[in-house]
Structures are given as C-alpha cells and as structure tokens.
Swiss-Prot record:
This protein's name: Queuine tRNA-ribosyltransferase
UniProt cofactor note: Binds 1 zinc ion per subunit.
EC number(s) recorded for this UniProt protein: 2.4.2.29
Annotated binding of Zn(2+), by residue: C302, C304, C307, H333
Recorded catalytic activity of this chain's protein: 7-aminomethyl-7-carbaguanine + guanosine(34) in tRNA = 7-aminomethyl-7-carbaguanosine(34) in tRNA + guanine
Active site: D89, D264
Enzyme class: transferase
Function: Catalyzes the base-exchange of a guanine (G) residue with the queuine precursor 7-aminomethyl-7-deazaguanine (PreQ1) at position 34 (anticodon wobble position) in tRNAs with GU(N) anticodons (tRNA-Asp, -Asn, -His and -Tyr). Catalysis occurs through a double-displacement mechanism. The nucleophile active site attacks the C1' of nucleotide 34 to detach the guanine base from the RNA, forming a covalent enzyme-RNA intermediate. The proton acceptor active site deprotonates the incoming PreQ1, allowing a nucleophilic attack on the C1' of the ribose to form the product.
Species annotation: Buchnera aphidicola subsp. Acyrthosiphon pisum (strain Tuc7)
Pathway, per record: tRNA modification; tRNA-queuosine biosynthesis
Chain sites annotated for binding substrate: D89, S90, G91, G92, F93, D143, G214
Length: 370
C-alpha cells in the first residue's frame, strides 16, 4: 500500500491509497462488515453505493466461520466475493467488551469467548497470524482497550501494554513477508500527555498508518475534538490517519477538519435497520405515521437506487411490516448518503472550499429530524 497526500485545505487533506493498482481516494469512509458481510446488502450493492474499502473483524471471523473455512476459499476477499481492499480490526475492543471473563498478562489475554464460553488465549502473534490468513490489506495491531474516564494510572498501564504489543505485532507481521500494511493504534485515553508518549513510541516502531483508538466510548464530543486537535498535527504527514469507530456525519466533517483521512462506523447501517435515514436536511424516521401517504422519495438530491425507485410511503410500509427488503433499501440509501458526503468533502478540499462546504452542511442539517 502506498499513500500520498495530493491536496490540502488548512488541515483537511485529500489523498490516495494505491493497493496494487486499485486507487482509493481519501478522506474515506469504510462500511463495517463485521462477519464478512455488510448487514442486509450484497457486495455488488456495496460497490454501487460508492464504497471501495470495507472493514471486517478478525476476532469474530476467527470464531465464525473459523480460519479453516475461509482458507478453503483462499482468503476473506474470495470468501465474501469482494474485490476491493479490506481492513481488519484485530479484536482488541471485542475481547474486552464481550468477554465475561478476561485476564491480561504481558503476552496477551485469556478470555471466555462469546460463542461457546471456552477459555481462549489471544496474543499479538496469534492476531497477526489470523489477519495474515484472512489476507487483510490493512492489518491493525493487537491492543488493549479500556473504558472511558479511567484514572491516569490505569490508562498509563494499558497504553504501555499496548505499546509492548505493538512492538510484538510489528515483529510477527514482518515475519510473514507479505505486501500488506500494518497500522499502529494511539492510546492514552483522555490524557494528552499519554497520547503523546504513545504516538512517539509508535513512530519509532514505524507503521504504515496511525489510528486513534479509545474514542467514541462515551466521552463528550468536545473532548474527542480537542484530542484530535492535539494529536493529529504530530502524526507524520506522509502517513494516513484513521479515526476508529467514529462516524456520525458531523463527526466526519470535524474529523476531516482536523486532518483525519479514514473513518469507519456502524451508524449508517445500524440506523438504516432502525428506520433512521440520512438526508440532506437531517434525519428521516421512516416509521413515523406522517410518511404513510408520502409519495416523494427520501431525498430528491440523492441518486441512489432506493431514491430512484421507491417512495417514503413504501419504505414506511416495509418498516411497519418488518420486511427484510426495507432494511436492504434503507442501508443502500444511508451508505450512498455517506459516500456522497465523502465525495463532496474531497471535492471541496481539492477546490479549497472545505470551510464553505462545512458551513453549508451545518446550515442544511437539522431542518428536519422526525
């Protein structure tokens, strides 16, 4: 993977990834396909929304269907029929959030897995092997995630352990001699001084990109934005910056404003399944009775399949009947909205009009939210 910044408007950046001749423009939003599938839609439909890179979770795929099944197909790309790049999360967050039992030592984590309750040992070495077997284009290091608002000492200990695991991840990743990329993850909770130490030590190890972890876990938005203001300027300018798990539309705007290049989040797909649909002027809650006889499309500025062929009335009906087609059409629309937003952001950076674009975005937003 090669990465290059081509345009800059203040701190907002527009660049390109080159994955073996496949070009991905940044800033980029990655739909989440935890189990090798973006919920309710096919890979062809994912592409038609404008999505070019997706995220899957190595932790979940390790347990279901298991590496043996995926390797029968060659790799995760073949298994799910996706020709584009895939980023895999190592599973650090899931180990700490899903396990009923979790014991940490310097080598890794012993936990009770959520599938069959068996005790499992996961280490940086095992995580790198899993992601190598999956054929991930971007591999994330194995890290320790902690809850928001932990005290300084607990946060420092977790950050230092993540750094130790980062070094181990680098060693084991390099041993596979593949051409994929490895990203480090900056930790340190809400403490800027710990974030500084984490980043500087990760830079010494030298990763292909740097992710900001441990955010969107309950902290006020203003704290997240302050941390981005603090840490993004310190990340090497020639390396991509990835804000993990953050993805409300306004978060994309504010992340890009501060120099972030990559995002992922379940919000567009999860909200779609709950009937919350993003449009130019805000959010439509399609199960509201007022849409029962509404013959208009969701958004007359949207060119997605859903808006071209279906009315709000029909989408309201599908939601009321809990029809699977409703989740599919809603997901197509929300992902198309997100990818159109990212495309417009990129164009505004190229034209040095990002600030005006963001002002217009906020002026239009929240005119409807019902």
């Amino acid at each position: 993977m090669n990465f290059e910044v081509l345009y800059q408007d203040n701190n907002a950046r527009c660049g390109v990834f080159n994955f073996n001749q496949e070009i991905i423009e940044t800033p980029v939003f990655m739909p989440v396909g935890t189990y090798g599938a973006v919920k309710s839609i096919s890979t062809e439909e994912i592409k038609n929304t404008g999505s070019r890179i997706i995220l899957s979770n190595a932790f979940h795929l390790y347990f279901r269907p298991g590496l043996e099944i995926i390797k029968l197909h060659g790799n995760l790309h073949n298994f799910m029929n996706w020709s584009g790049p895939i980023l895999t999360d190592s599973g650090g967050f899931q180990v700490f959030s899903l396990s009923r039992f979790c014991k940490i030592n310097e080598e890794g984590v012993i936990f009770q897995n959520h599938i069959d309750g068996k005790k499992t040992f996961l280490t940086p070495k095992i995580s790198m092997k899993i992601q190598s077997d999956l054929g991930s284009n971007i591999v994330m290091i194995f890290d320790q995630c902690i809850e928001y608002n932990q005290n300084w000492e607990k946060t420092k200990n977790a950050m230092e352990r993540s750094l130790y695991w980062a070094k181990k991840s680098r060693i084991y990743f390099d041993s596979y001699k593949n051409k994929n990329s490895l990203f480090g993850i900056i930790h340190g909770g809400i403490y800027p001084s710990l974030r500084d130490i984490s980043l500087q030590e990760l830079i010494k190890i030298d990763f292909d990109g740097y992710a900001l972890g441990g955010l969107a876990v309950g902290e006020p938005k203003i704290e997240m934005y302050k941390l981005l203001d603090h840490i993004c300027p310190q990340i090497p300018k020639n390396k991509p910056r990835y804000l993990m798990g953050v993805g409300k539309p306004e978060d994309l705007i504010e992340g890009v404003r501060r120099g972030v290049d990559m995002f992922d989040c379940v919000i567009p797909t999860r909200n779609a399944r709950n009937g919350h649909l993003f449009v130019t002027n805000g959010v439509i809650k399609i199960r509201n009775k007022k849409y029962k006889k509404d013959l208009s499309c969701l958004d007359n500025t949207c060119a997605c399949y859903t808006c071209r062929y279906y009315s709000r009335s029909y989408l309201h009906h599908l939601d009321a009947c809990n029809e699977i087609l409703g989740a599919r059409l809603n997901t197509i629309h929300n992902l198309h909205y997100y990818q159109t937003l990212m495309s417009n952001i990129r164009n505004s950076i190229k034209n040095n009009t990002f600030e005006q674009f963001s002002l217009n975005f906020y002026k239009q937003k929240n005119k409807i939210d019902f």
